[in-house]
Every structure is written in structure tokens, then in C-alpha cells.
Amino acid sequence: MNRLALYCRQGFEKECAAEITAKAAELEVFGFARVKDNSGYVLFECYQPDDADRLAKEIPFRELIFARQILVVGELLRDLPPEDRVSPIVGMLIGVVDRGGELRVEVPDTNESKELLKFCRKLTVPLRTAMREQKVLMARENKTRPVVHVFFIAPGCCYVGYSFSNNNSPFYMGIPRLKFPSDAPSRSTLKLEEAFHVFIPADEWDERLASGMHAVDLGACPGGWTYQLVQRSMMVHAVDNGPMAPSLMDTGQVTHHRADGFRYEPSSSKIYWLVCDMVEKPAKVTSLMIQWLVKGWCREAIFNLKLPMKKRYEEVSQNLLAIKEALDTAGISSEIHAKQLYHDREEVTVHVRRMWSAVAGRRDERD
């Protein structure tokens, strides 16, 4: 098995391919990407044996922007016999995966694959049973062991492989299953909820998404992102010239500032979170976020960058580099991650966390 399969949003295959090619080259691993437009996945074939396994271990999954999942796979299994689809799949894994912890039978996230998904659900139980008999899977699920993937791209055609549980998406098909809250002002609320799941470790939520924190939402109207902050009992400064949902204002947790998000400056020194989902050029939003972070107006920020039609990977990379260089120049240590979330469209979501100041006398923690 010497290739990677990467799941991605339909229509973003070229960006996913450019990214994995660049990341592999950084590790001096070379190969070529196979891209089929609107397929929802990318294949990266390595030139040297065992390089795919190395990449799946050594490229930090959380640093991949456009990939929803990364796994090692072998040759495409074609024309699986209808009378016995299980045996060829299991046979390909014997000697490759020993006592995997979980089985996921998946498809690309496309409209064309929806019918195929129903078949995958039916196949999962007999596959799991056969894999346990052959010791490909453990008798019980184990979250610390490799995950076995069977990835159907068409009826009777699938890739078979594995991912590492400490360097993959924990979600089936790489998609967190979130339910839209009926009282939320807009569906955009799911973007921020997903961002919390992707960027903030679950065991740090009580500390970093704590009740009583102060937050600012730039371009807040009608309040989809503010809703998530209010649900976590934060005090929110919502900045927008447009109206906010009355249900949010009635909580007493929201202060509405009728102002331009690009001109607003906080009067409070207690702001921990900054969130922003404004429809504007990526460079302009990036410049605004740099201002907030360098001036210490917030400790963590989550914001969206709307993408152009062309050179989207390059655009994102340039803006992330601009943030890093600005913070480095200011002597501020930081963590910077970006992801095209399931609930994103022509955009990516960025998370920046100020860690500490490298300059003597500069304060990072706000009073």
C-alpha cells in the first residue's frame, strides 16, 4: 500500500492535491496526485515503498487545510463479486493491518454517492464480523488502534486501507454530525460549533470556552456565531450595523454595537475570544485579525476567509504566512491552524491562539 487517499469538499480536489504535494515535499517524499474534478477525494501515489505510511504518520493531520481525512490505501479493488464482496476486501488487509480498533465503510461526500452510502451501511456488519475472525479487527472497538477504512467510489469498486487514530479525523467520513439548533438565528452557527470541535481539544473546553468569558463577534448580524458564545454563557459584544436576533438580546448577555467591524475598537481589556465571519476579501480580514492579535485585544480568534475562484490554496497560504510573520515580528508566540470545515463553502476557517509574549514586559493575559 503506497498511496494516500484524502477526502475533501467536492470541487476542492485541486487545492487538496496541491497541499498534500507540498506537505510531502517538505518531508522529502515525492510522488504525484491523481485528481478527478468534483469527485470529493484525491489520491497521492508515492514513488518509494512505505512512503505513504510515513506521510500518514508524520504529516500532522490538523495542519492539513483541505483534507477531511487521510488514509493509506492500496490498489483499487474493482468488480467485487455480488455474491461475496467481503472476502476480497478482508484478504487485502490480512498482513497489512493487525487488530485494528475500528471499521469505517465510507464514500465520497457527493450527491452521486448517497445511494452508495446505504449499501455501505448494510455491508459494515458482515465486514466487521469477517475482519474480527481474521484478526484484522480487535473483538471490541479500541480508539488507540489504527482505523480500518473501506472507501467505495462506485458500486463494486473500493479502496481499502487504514489511518492512524492519533493522526486522523475522529469522525465518520471526516464529517462531524451536528444538529442545527431550532432557536439559532442562522445556519452559520454550525460553522463556529464545528470550529470548536476541530480546533479546541474536548478536555480543554471547560478552560478555553468557559462560562463568563468575554467575547467580540465582528459582523455579527443576525447572530449565528454570537448564538454559540451565548450558549456557552459568555458575555458578547456583537458588532454590526444590522439588527441582531431579539432572542439573543433578551438573554442579557449581548451588547449590540451598531458599528463597522473594521473600525470598532474594544473598550474592555477582558476580551478572550474574537470571532468574525464577514464577507470581505481575505487580505482585508487577515489585516484586521493581525491588528487585534498584535495589540492584544483578544487571546484567541476564529474567523473565516472567503476564497477567490482561482489559486485558493496559494491565497490561504499567503494569508496564514502574513499572520505568522506579523506575530513573530511582534514577539508573540502563537498557534495557527486553518481548515475547510464541512459547514464552510467557498471559504476556510482559521484559528489563532496567542500563547505568550517573547518580549520582556509585554503582557499577553488580559486583566
Curated annotation (Swiss-Prot):
Gene name as annotated: rlmM
Subunit structure, as described in the record: Monomer.
Catalyses which reaction(s): cytidine(2498) in 23S rRNA + S-adenosyl-L-methionine = 2'-O-methylcytidine(2498) in 23S rRNA + S-adenosyl-L-homocysteine + H(+)
One Pfam family it belongs to: RlmM_FDX
GO molecular function, one term: S-adenosylmethionine-dependent methyltransferase activity
EC supergroup of this enzyme: transferase
Keyword S-adenosyl-L-methionine: yes
NCBIfam families reported for this sequence: PRK11760.1 (NF008734)
Binding site for S-adenosyl-L-methionine: 188, 221-224, 240, 260, 277
Family: Belongs to the class I-like SAM-binding methyltransferase superfamily. RNA methyltransferase RlmE family. RlmM subfamily.
UniProt GO cellular component terms: cytoplasm
Record-given protein name: Ribosomal RNA large subunit methyltransferase M
Keywords recorded for this protein, A-Z: Cytoplasm, Methyltransferase, rRNA processing, S-adenosyl-L-methionine, Transferase
Organism field: Serratia proteamaculans (strain 568)
Predominant localisation class: cytoplasm
